[in-house]
């Protein structure tokens, strides 16, 4: 075990808005750290962002069948898997935990991982990843002309303007989660808890690196926006993290998500009638054979079963079940699969402790070419080929695209107003034509207040006009991305007079 690694360096009780000041990475009072993390749990569990997940898409938008997963039920499953990984990690480490500074941290790490898992999807817009595409597509087509109308060519800072344009054209759910926690909900979580959400490490205005680049994995998506860059810089300072690195908690959260959703999406497809369990069993074995031998024993399985035998065993148990064959199939399959996958994730954390501690491991814990990796990839392959491209899913995604594009079209007049007029409206003063007044009144007060608060921060900035328009665009993205699927559909219908 690497003696130079000390996980306690990455844990601090410090918060952005603290009455007390702590030193670098803070504080070795473990009892107080656990107490502060309990406060984080309360803030997160009681937040509106978590409640909204119950009406946001996992795979099937606007789903009425409560047995099919929403983002909330998915996040609860990820939370449980994350907890299981942490407990398995400490069981596998045993007394060696002290060698890497993990002694006494089981409760703290468990809470950090659980809450990172629960929050990992809060930044996702309505209609899932297709919703992200719809927002970015609208801004790609409209933003340059809107920006030029407010900031004519030759005025302002050219480099800053280019960064702002690129930033706004790359909306991403992970980056939005950071913004939501820090600027919109103002949860004032410990820096350590928020760091667990930083799955990707580059600002949205920086280009995506080539796949061959050493830093590609951690930078393949935006991790935060220009508007939160100062916060992320301070987070890194407090936790002793170098730029371009991840917090160790993010690796466990990611592994828990990978393990949970790959099987859950398949189960939902059976619940929806897209596949039956016999079809699924055949597909799983065929797809697994592409990556690995289906007859090879799976490490960590108590019965030394192969993938083929696990699938057959689950099918046999389901056939004997007189009432709910589908449920029995997935219960058996999940129990047989989850244990070896969780053990593998925990062992990968241990085997790569130096890189995980430094935040430089350039892959997911489950992506190592191993047999457990083949299991996860098999489920993803089946979901990609048989679930995500199903006509029902694609039709709902197209409807979601039209809804989000339509909402942005409806509210675009607010981006065409002069800065003075929009600020007057945001402050509650009558300073524009009736149409934009009515639009502003439909915006949540929370998002208007976040805009006004951002404007206070640039009141004396010579580039205030650029920042004002940037924050106005952010506010519109906050508004649309914060909607549930149903709210977005209702708002679209209302403004379309349907």
Swiss-Prot record:
Residues 71-262 form the HD domain. SUPFAM superfamilies: HD-domain/PDEase-like (SSF109604). The keyword tRNA processing does not apply. One of its GO terms (biological process) is dGTP catabolic process. It comes from the Bacteria. InterPro entries: dGTP_triP_hydro_central_sf (IPR023293), dGTPase (IPR006261), dGTPase-like (IPR050135), dNTPase_1 (IPR020779), HD/PDEase_dom (IPR003607), HD_domain (IPR006674). It is an enzyme of class 3 (hydrolase). One of its GO terms (molecular function) is magnesium ion binding. Its EC number is 3.1.5.1. It catalyses: dGTP + H2O = 2'-deoxyguanosine + triphosphate + H(+). Pfam families: HD. Keywords: Hydrolase, Magnesium. Its cofactor is Mg(2+). The keyword Electron transport does not apply. SMART domains: HDc (SM00471). CDD domains: HDc. dGTPase preferentially hydrolyzes dGTP over the other canonical NTPs. Belongs to the dGTPase family. Type 1 subfamily. PANTHER family: DEOXYGUANOSINETRIPHOSPHATE TRIPHOSPHOHYDROLASE, DEOXYNUCLEOSIDE TRIPHOSPHATE TRIPHOSPHOHYDROLASE. NCBIfam families: dGTP_triPase, PRK04926.1. This is Probable deoxyguanosinetriphosphate triphosphohydrolase. The gene is dgt.
């Amino acid at each position: 075990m690497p003696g130079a690694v000390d996980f306690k360096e990455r844990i601090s009780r410090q918060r952005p808005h603290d009455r007390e000041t702590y030193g670098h990475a803070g504080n070795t009072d473990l009892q107080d750290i656990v107490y502060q993390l309990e406060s984080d749990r309360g803030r997160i569990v009681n937040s509106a962002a978590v409640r909204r997940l119950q009406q946001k898409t996992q795979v099937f938008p606007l789903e009425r069948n409560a047995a099919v997963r929403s983002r909330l039920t998915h996040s609860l499953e990820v939370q449980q898997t994350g907890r299981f990984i942490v407990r398995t990690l400490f069981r596998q480490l045993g007394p060696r935990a002290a060698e890497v500074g993990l002694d006494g941290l089981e409760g703290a790490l468990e809470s950090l991982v659980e809450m990172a898992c629960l929050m990992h999807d809060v930044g996702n817009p309505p209609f899932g990843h297709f919703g992200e595409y719809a927002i970015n597509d609208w801004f790609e087509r409209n933003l340059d002309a809107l920006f030029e109308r407010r900031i004519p060519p030759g005025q302002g800072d050219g480099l800053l303007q280019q960064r702002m344009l690129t930033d706004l054209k790359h909306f991403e759910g992970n980056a939005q989660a950071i913004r939501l926690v820090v600027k919109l909900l103002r949860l004032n979580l410990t820096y350590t808890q928020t760091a667990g959400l930083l799955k990707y490490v580059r600002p949205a205005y920086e280009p995506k690196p080539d796949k061959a680049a050493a830093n590609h994995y951690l930078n393949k998506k935006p991790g935060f926006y220009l508007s939160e860059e100062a916060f992320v810089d301070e987070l890194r300072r407090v936790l002793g993290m170098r730029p371009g690195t991840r917090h160790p908690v993010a690796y466990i959260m990611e592994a828990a998500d990978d393990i949970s959703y790959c099987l859950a999406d398949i189960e939902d497809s059976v619940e929806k009638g897209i596949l039956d369990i016999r079809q699924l069993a055949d597909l799983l074995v065929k797809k697994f054979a592409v990556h690995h031998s289906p007859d090879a024993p799976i490490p960590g399985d108590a019965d030394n079963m192969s993938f083929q035998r696990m699938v057959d065993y689950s099918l046999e148990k389901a056939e004997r079940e007189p009432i709910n064959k589908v449920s029995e199939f997935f219960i058996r399959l999940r129990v047989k699969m989850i244990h070896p996958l969780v053990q593998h994730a925990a062992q990968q954390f241990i085997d790569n402790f130096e890189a995980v501690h430094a935040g430089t491991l350039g892959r997911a814990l489950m992506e190592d070419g191993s047999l457990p990796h083949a299991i996860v990839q098999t489920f993803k392959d089946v979901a990609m080929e048989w679930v995500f491209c199903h006509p029902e899913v694609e039709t709902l995604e197209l409807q979601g695209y039209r809804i989000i594009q339509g909402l942005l079209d409806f509210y675009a007049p607010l981006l065409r107003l002069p800065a003075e007029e929009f600020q007057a409206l945001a402050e509650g003063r009558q300073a524009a034509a009736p149409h934009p007044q009515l639009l502003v009144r439909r915006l949540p007060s929370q998002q208007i207040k976040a805009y006004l608060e951002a404007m206070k921060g640039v009141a004396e900035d010579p580039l205030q006009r650029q920042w004002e328009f940037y924050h106005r665009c952010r506010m519109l993205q906050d508004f649309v991305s914060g909607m549930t699927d149903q709210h977005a559909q209702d708002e679209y219908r209302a403004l379309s007079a349907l």
